[in-house]
Amino acid sequence: MQCPTCQNTDSRVLESRSADTGKSVRRRRECLNCSFRFTTYERVETMPISVLKKDGSRELFNKDKLVTGISRACEKTTFSREAIIDFVDSIESQIIQDSNKDIKSSQIGELILKGLRKENEVAYIRYASVYRKFNGVKDFVSTLESLKGSSKNELASIL
């Protein structure tokens, strides 16, 4: 690993520990030339995921786009920034496990809706209104009724 101050490639590892909930390794290093201490992170390299858009184009999966969209849906709710990032991490893990390098944007949207429905109904409605392009009150009402119906079914199954 190259030292950030003197660019020497010889260093020794002082400490290693798991980071990012086991997805990476954090290492404290010391340069053998100038004794500067620095931190590095090692992560497993994953194959890039292509998102197949509705118009037929492809783009690389962008985790930040999910964080931004979900953050907007979760404004003024109990979702913290950390919870949103954890939520996006879980969606990314599902995508990596379920896909073979390509996934449709509609599948990503449905994964988000499924997760938001369980976590926060307000965020679910907000995200659904943009994702499903609600045109009016009828769209909101039908989505609210489906939420209400599933809540009744869940309650009935518990009782």
Curated annotation (Swiss-Prot):
UniProt keyword terms in alphabetical order: ATP-binding, DNA-binding, Metal-binding, Nucleotide-binding, Repressor, Transcription, Transcription regulation, Zinc, Zinc-finger
Residues in ATP-cone domain copies: 49-139
Pfam families (alphabetical): ATP-cone, Zn_ribbon_NrdR
Coiled-coil features, chain-numbered ranges: none
Signal peptide stretch: none
GO molecular function: ATP binding; DNA binding; zinc ion binding
Start and end residues, zinc fingers (unnamed): 3-34
Bound cofactor: record note: Binds 1 zinc ion.
Co-factor(s): Zn(2+)
One of the GO biological process terms: negative regulation of DNA-templated transcription
UniProt record similarity statement: Belongs to the NrdR family.
Its job: Negatively regulates transcription of bacterial ribonucleotide reductase nrd genes and operons by binding to NrdR-boxes.
HAMAP family per UniProt: NrdR
Classification via PANTHER family: TRANSCRIPTIONAL REPRESSOR NRDR (PTHR30455:SF2)
Protein name stated in the entry: Transcriptional repressor NrdR
Organism: Prochlorococcus marinus (strain MIT 9515)
Lineage: Bacteria, Bacillati, Cyanobacteriota, Cyanophyceae, Synechococcales
